[in-house]
């Protein structure tokens, strides 16, 4: 069976990617990161999801939190803002996060003989993060095949971003068709220890709108009653 490394945050998109990779016949090696994120409940969710969905293995890598300063997701002194339409890169951007995560996934993949890496990046219904754009994914794939023994020898890597051009509605519809239990997932940028969502941040807003527009019951547990 072919192997794939799947970046698994515990959120909606990465869980959909895990389900999709499994449906394509991959033995999935889930990889999560503890990097000082305030929404650490997502790591508990990732553990539940990996077990529930039958991942071949699940590793949680602890990174030095000093690598990720200056973000509302890692610095308690910076407030996570409520959702607001804006073309600007928000304060929830974590410096070079996907680059670092993919680099770790690449090393792991080469070491276990996997040549496919899955990431839940999307350039639709997102917060203008530069490391979610298709040109970033394409560039990293080129780098992967220039920087590794396997790549140089022609055993090439593929960086799979299957949600790249899907809206949140489409991602939810796809996951629902694949049998994903979204009640296990945590997407909120500031979920409490119980995994209950704030309902106000960018991630919560995109998620709520997605379920509503998809006509799928929202299984998210919220900290308080909120409205779009």
UniProtKB/Swiss-Prot annotation:
GO MF: ATP binding; ligase activity, forming carbon-nitrogen bonds; zinc ion binding
Co-factor note (free text): Binds 1 zinc ion per subunit.
Positions that bind ATP: 8-18
Domain of life: Bacteria
SUPFAM superfamilies noted in UniProt: Adenine nucleotide alpha hydrolases-like (SSF52402)
Residues noted as binding Zn(2+) in the record, renumbered to the chain: 188, 198, 201, 204
Enzyme class, first EC level, given as a word: ligase
Cofactor field: Zn(2+)
Secretion signal, residue range per the UniProt entry: none
One GO term (biological process): queuosine biosynthetic process
Documented EC number(s): 6.3.4.20
Catalytic activity: 7-carboxy-7-deazaguanine + NH4(+) + ATP = 7-cyano-7-deazaguanine + ADP + phosphate + H2O + H(+)
Biological pathway: Purine metabolism; 7-cyano-7-deazaguanine biosynthesis
Pfam families linked: QueC
Entry keyword set: ATP-binding, Ligase, Metal-binding, Nucleotide-binding, Queuosine biosynthesis, Zinc
Annotated function: Catalyzes the ATP-dependent conversion of 7-carboxy-7-deazaguanine (CDG) to 7-cyano-7-deazaguanine (preQ(0)).
NCBIfam families: 7-cyano-7-deazaguanine synthase QueC
Family, as annotated: Belongs to the QueC family.
Protein name listed in UniProt: 7-cyano-7-deazaguanine synthase
Species in which this protein is naturally found: Legionella pneumophila (strain Paris)
């Amino acid at each position: 069976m072919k192997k794939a490394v799947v970046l698994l945050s515990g959120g909606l998109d990465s869980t959909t990617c895990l389900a999709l990779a499994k449906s394509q016949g991959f033995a999935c090696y889930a990889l999560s990161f503890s990097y000082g994120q305030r929404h650490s409940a997502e790591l508990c969710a990732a553990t539940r999801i990996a077990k529930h969905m039958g991942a071949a293995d699940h590793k949680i890598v602890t990174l030095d939190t000093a690598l990720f300063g200056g973000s509302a997701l890692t610095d308690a002194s910076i407030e996570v803002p409520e959702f607001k339409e804006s073309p600007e890169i928000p304060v929830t951007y974590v410096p070079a996060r996907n680059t670092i995560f993919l680099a770790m996934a690449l090393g792991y993949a080469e070491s276990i003989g996997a040549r496919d890496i899955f990431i839940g990046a999307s350039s639709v219904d997102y917060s203008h993060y530069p490391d979610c754009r298709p040109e970033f994914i394409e560039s990293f794939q080129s780098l992967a095949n220039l920087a590794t023994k396997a790549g140089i020898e022609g055993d090439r890597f593929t960086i799979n971003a299957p949600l790249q051009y899907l809206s949140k509605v489409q991602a939810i519809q796809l996951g629902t068709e694949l049998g994903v239990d979204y009640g296990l997932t945590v997407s909120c940028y500031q979920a409490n220890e119980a995994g209950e969502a704030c309902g106000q941040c960018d991630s919560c807003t995109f998620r709520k709108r997605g379920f509503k527009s998809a006509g799928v019951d929202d299984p998210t547990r919220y900290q308080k009653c909120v409205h779009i």
